[in-house]
């Protein structure tokens, strides 16, 4: 669920931007864009017009977008758009922690908490496609502890939960 105004903690440099400190609402697209611009500037990487537009298209959706859906959208604006254009933009956005790849859907969703990109859970509604990101630190710590007990070092945690969102359950 998107919110036009969301109570988030944003430092001036946007390094700790996260809409999930106390809320489960996604920030609006303009907030996500400001966060992405600040993150890229802080990391001295170029947030090119194509990368920005791909990020914007992903941020406008509550559900994930597949690469070829992105290509169709971008092609309507830029006739020169080709699959490598989209995949390069997606690789960049993933590398910067600005989007997540939803493995089960082979789709992409905006990440409102790039500082927490190492560990997160995605709740995916199987009816309407809504994707909500949460951060349950207890789950992450238990998994790290269990893995360490087996001599395994977790580099990234991404848990996908499939079910029905509140809207679809009420319908």
Segments and roles (model prediction):
Residues 59-62, 75:
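Short, locally clustered residues in the helix-turn-helix/winged-helix DNA-binding domain
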Residues 69-75, 86:
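A short acidic, leucine-rich amphipathic alpha-helix
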Residues 52-57:
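Pre-recognition alpha-helix immediately N-terminal to the DNA-recognition helix
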Residues 47, 61-66:
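Short capping segments at the starts of secondary-structure elements
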Residues 2-32, 38, 137-171:
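C-terminal regulatory/oligomerization modules of transcriptional regulators
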């Amino acid at each position: 669920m998107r919110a036009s105004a969301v109570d988030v903690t944003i430092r001036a440099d946007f390094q700790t931007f996260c809409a999930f400190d106390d809320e489960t609402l996604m920030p609006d697209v303009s907030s996500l864009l400001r966060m992405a611009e600040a993150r890229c500037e802080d990391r001295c990487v170029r947030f090119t017009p194509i990368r920005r537009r791909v990020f914007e298209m992903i941020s406008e959706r509550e559900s994930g977008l597949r690469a070829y859906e992105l290509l169709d959208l971008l092609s309507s604006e830029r006739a020169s758009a080709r699959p490598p254009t989209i995949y390069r933009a997606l690789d960049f956005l993933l590398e910067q922690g600005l989007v997540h790849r939803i493995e089960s859907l082979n789709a992409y969703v905006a990440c409102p908490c790039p500082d927490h990109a190492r560990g997160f859970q995605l709740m995916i509604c199987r009816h309407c496609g809504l994707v909500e990101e949460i951060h349950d630190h207890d789950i992450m710590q238990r998994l790290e502890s269990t893995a360490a007990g087996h001599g395994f070092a977790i580099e990234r945690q991404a848990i996908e939960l499939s079910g029905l969102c509140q809207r679809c359950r009420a319908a």
